[in-house]
């Protein structure tokens, strides 16, 4: 199935995870901003408040609808922990905030190095489902359908994977790109 990637193990590094949760209850943002330290709230600039956690180092966006979006985590566990810590702190202000809520991973951004330079013009000509406009952006955009991820390929051999919901999808996306580039003698 993967004749080329067995030659070496592609090291995938998670750069950022975006997760969300809905606590099913409206939140009075002014109360939260006054009660918690590390909160930025300016309704004219942004409809939610930004709460920065030190451990794990993340930022949570809190909206009056009760929806939270956490960004900046480097692992799924840290992402979930950040949301749980944020909700626990909010519960000290509003004890009616439910203890049960679902956390969804929305996006994983990961990077890898293919250990080989790429001729992006040749890749754009040979590889399907790509966009390459070097005047607009130095990377080549490669869209995969399985797994459903978008890869940014750079001439240096660096790759950024976005849109993954799991670490394994990010890794599989990079491996499939490597295999396809190998099949076409582009790497």
Regions found by a protein language model. Name each.
Residues 9-150, 156-158, 164-187:
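Intrinsically disordered, low-complexity polar/charged tails and linkers
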Residues 1-7:
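Short, small-residue-biased leader/transition segments that mark boundaries at the very start
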């Amino acid at each position: 199935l993967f004749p080329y990637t067995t030659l070496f193990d592609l090291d995938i590094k998670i750069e950022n995870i975006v997760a969300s949760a809905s606590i099913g209850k409206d939140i009075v943002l002014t109360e939260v901003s006054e009660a918690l330290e590390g909160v930025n709230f300016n309704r004219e600039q942004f409809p939610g408040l930004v709460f920065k956690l030190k451990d794990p180092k993340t930022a949570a966006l809190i909206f009056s609808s009760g929806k939270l979006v956490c960004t900046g985590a480097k692992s799924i566990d840290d992402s979930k922990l950040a949301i749980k810590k944020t909700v626990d702190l909010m519960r000290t202000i509003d004890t009616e905030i439910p203890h049960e809520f679902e956390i969804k991973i929305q996006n994983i951004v990961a990077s890898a190095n293919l250990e080989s330079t790429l001729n992006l013009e040749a890749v754009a000509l040979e590889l399907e489902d790509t966009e390459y406009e070097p005047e607009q952006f130095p990377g080549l955009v490669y869209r995969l359908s399985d797994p459903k991820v978008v890869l940014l390929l750079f001439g240096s051999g660096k790759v950024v994977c976005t849109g993954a919901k799991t670490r394994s999808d990010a890794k599989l996306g990079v491996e499939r790109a490597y295999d396809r580039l190998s099949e076409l003698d582009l790497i």
